[in-house]
């Protein structure tokens, strides 16, 4: 197993159980990794096999060498999970803003339905793309609240005006009119 594989395992949370601080250990484990790899390479050079006792001592020595490591904030931890796994494992980015934004709209994306009047939808941008149609181009932003995903068509003028705010993995709140999509059967 190489260093890059260990980085992915740490970022995904797969090694949380190996540390006394659980999920709070990811930053410490990542900081520790170069020393651990160097130490393992040195051991490999010195001897062909280690006893179980020596491995425990090695782990303890390495952990004692790590000092002043800041615990990752929830957002950083979730983004590291997504980077290594392709999805959020221990939660969702939307959970970090859900309570705070319920004052404006408590509507979950799974409960939206076509209505003549617009209403506020909120979530995390999971993807965005430009699609060419017979009528021209349309900008599509996919919003995810951890329970459902919806695609929002954004007019070119609005997309260009707010393009600096429409970033992947960022929270967005959009006043939108929900219509049925006869082509895909969705909304």
Question: Predicted segment positions?
Answer:
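Sliding clamp-binding short linear motifs
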Residues: 1-114, 177-179
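Single-stranded nucleic-acid-binding OB-fold domains
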Residues: 19, 92-187
């Amino acid at each position: 197993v190489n260093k890059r594989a260990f980085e992915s395992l740490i970022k995904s949370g797969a090694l949380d159980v190996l540390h006394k601080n659980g999920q709070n250990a990811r930053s410490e484990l990542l900081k520790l990794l170069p020393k651990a790899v160097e130490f393992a390479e040195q051991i490999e050079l010195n001897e062909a096999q280690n006893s179980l006792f020596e491995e425990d001592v090695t782990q303890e020595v390495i952990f004692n060498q790590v000092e002043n490591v800041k615990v990752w904030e929830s957002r950083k931890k979730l983004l590291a999970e997504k980077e290594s796994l392709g999805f959020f494992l221990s939660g969702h980015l939307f959970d970090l803003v859900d309570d705070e934004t319920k004052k404006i709209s408590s509507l979950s994306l799974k409960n939206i339905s076509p209505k003549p009047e617009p209403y506020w939808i909120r979530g995390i941008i999971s993807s965005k793309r430009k699609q060419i149609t017979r009528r021209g181009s349309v900008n599509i932003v996919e919003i995810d609240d951890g329970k459902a995903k919806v695609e929002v068509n954004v007019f070119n003028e609005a997309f260009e005006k707010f393009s600096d705010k429409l970033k992947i993995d960022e929270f967005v709140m959009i006043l939108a009119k929900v219509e049925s999509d006869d082509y895909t059967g969705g909304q």
